[in-house]
Curated annotation (Swiss-Prot):
Keyword Magnesium tagged: no
Predominant cellular place of this UniProt entry's protein: cytoplasm
GO biological process: histidyl-tRNA aminoacylation
Enzyme Commission code(s) on record: 6.1.1.21
Keyword Protein biosynthesis (UniProt): yes
Keyword annotations of the record: Aminoacyl-tRNA synthetase, ATP-binding, Cytoplasm, Ligase, Nucleotide-binding, Protein biosynthesis
GN (gene name): hisS
Record-stated family: Belongs to the class-II aminoacyl-tRNA synthetase family.
GO cellular component: cytoplasm
Compartments where located: Cytoplasm
Protein name: Histidine--tRNA ligase
PROSITE patterns noted in UniProt: AA_TRNA_LIGASE_II (PS50862)
Enzymatic reactions: tRNA(His) + L-histidine + ATP = L-histidyl-tRNA(His) + AMP + diphosphate + H(+)
Length: 408
């Protein structure tokens, strides 16, 4: 037996777990302010839920999915992202739109582990269905900015945004890219050669050094916008300006999945090395209809909890315990009752079972207790307790019935 975590996974202990839960709980609280409803899906789905939605040229489909056949011979996949499963939920449950859904949990991709990238990772996920208005895009981006401010990292994380335009724009731009990249086909990386056939827009997302110089001179999508696409994008940029959200238009930003149209965006930082995206998302107006639902415009984004953890400074507020020190067998019989009473009044109690009084007082100091409650046969007979203020060393006798009122 190997007593270590699987490569690309990690344990969360103590303060690290408090930080994790702080991020999750903050996101949930902020989601309520924007009218999002909670939604949770299973961590695995039928494989076709993902293959039908993510596009056969995406790295997730071609390289990264954890898939297996169950005992009934069905192909099952651990979710690599949330949107496909949430779309499945929307269709299966016949949810009425417009609707905003918030979800959180683990996802799984077979990637090379590095800072900010694990094979099991956790996301906070926001999806808006049934709103075609660009104001939804603006509101969602402002929500990300709100989260960044809450986490105290808004100054180090910058918004990059692009528009892929409508269907007509994407078709024309696709043709232009095929024409351009075909001239350099022999110089492209193997991944980009494959993408040239399946989805040339994805070449723009390549991190391969062989591709970068070729990509730099590629046609710009803004030259192929229809008037509708151009107007839609302009409204979003104007809205961001009104909200004083700084941005950079990145013409090469396409995101890693094939279902996007119109708005795509990433909130990026240099503090995570190569894995610079903290939050990312975009619009996917045709995704729901492409998998059997009715036409439903949609936009969403996700943020990586582990990546946010790398960036934020968070220490849980230390809660100092009450240290319970019974002396003698009779006192020990009453100690559990007292501990239960204190805990049910919201107090953090450590009940020290054994040891000399000196040893237990030393442990109370080590635990940074705010008070010690000491009682033996004498206190039991007089229905009192001795309470010691661990800050000042002051001791006093209190009535057993007034314990809660006398806790420091």
């Amino acid at each position: 037996m190997t007593n270590q975590t699987v490569r690309g996974t990690k344990d969360f202990l103590f303060d690290e777990w408090y930080k994790f839960k702080h991020i999750e709980q903050t996101a949930s609280r902020i989601s309520n302010l924007y009218g999002f409803l909670p939604a949770q899906t299973p961590i695995f789905e039928y494989t076709e839920v993902f293959t039908k939605t993510l596009g056969d040229s995406s790295d997730i489909i071609t390289k990264e999915m954890y898939s297996f056949n169950d005992k009934g011979g069905k192909s099952i996949t651990l979710r690599p992202e949330f949107t496909a499963a949430i779309v499945r939920l929307l269709i299966e449950k016949k949810l009425q739109t417009p609707i905003k859904l918030f979800s959180t949990g683990p996802a799984f991709r077979y990637e090379r582990p590095q800072k900010g990238r694990q094979r099991q990772f956790h996301q906070i996920n926001f999806e808006v269905f049934g709103i075609e208005d660009p104001k939804a895009d603006i509101e969602l981006i402002s929500l990300v900015q709100h989260l960044l401010t809450e986490f105290g990292i808004n100054k180090n994380v910058k918004l990059e945004i692009n528009s892929l335009g409508d269907g007509e724009t994407i078709t024309k731009y696709r043709e232009a890219l095929i024409l351009y990249f075909t001239k350099y086909q022999n110089d492209l990386s193997e991944d980009s050669k494959n993408r040239l056939i399946k989805n040339p827009l994805r070449i723009l997302d390549s991190k391969d050094e062989k591709d970068k110089s070729i990509i730099s001179d590629a046609p710009k999508i803004s030259n192929y916008y229809t008037k509708g696409s151009s107007d839609f994008f302009e409204q979003i940029l104007n809205g961001l300006t009104i909200l004083d959200i700084p941005y950079t238009v990145n013409n090469k930003l396409v995101r890693g999945l094939d279902y996007y149209c119109h708005t795509v965006f990433e909130f990026v930082t240099e503090d995570l090395g190569a894995q610079g995206a903290v939050f990312a998302g975009g619009r996917y107006d045709n995704l729901v209809s492409s998998v059997g639902g009715k036409h439903t415009p949609a936009i969403g984004f996700a943020g990586g909890i582990e990546r946010i953890m790398e960036l934020i400074n968070y220490s849980p507020k230390e809660e100092r315990p009450i240290y319970l020190i019974p002396i003698g067998r009779e006192a020990e019989k009453h100690a559990l009752t007292l501990a239960n009473e204190l805990r049910r009044n919201g107090l953090y109690v450590i009940y020290e079972y054994s040891g000399t009084l000196r040893t237990r007082m030393k442990k109370a100091n080590q635990a940074n207790a705010k008070a010690a409650l000491i009682f033996g046969d004498e206190e039991l007979s007089s229905k009192t307790l001795k309470i010691k203020n661990m800050n000042t060393g002051e001791e006093k006798i209190i009535a057993r019935d007034n314990t809660i009122e006398n806790i420091y």
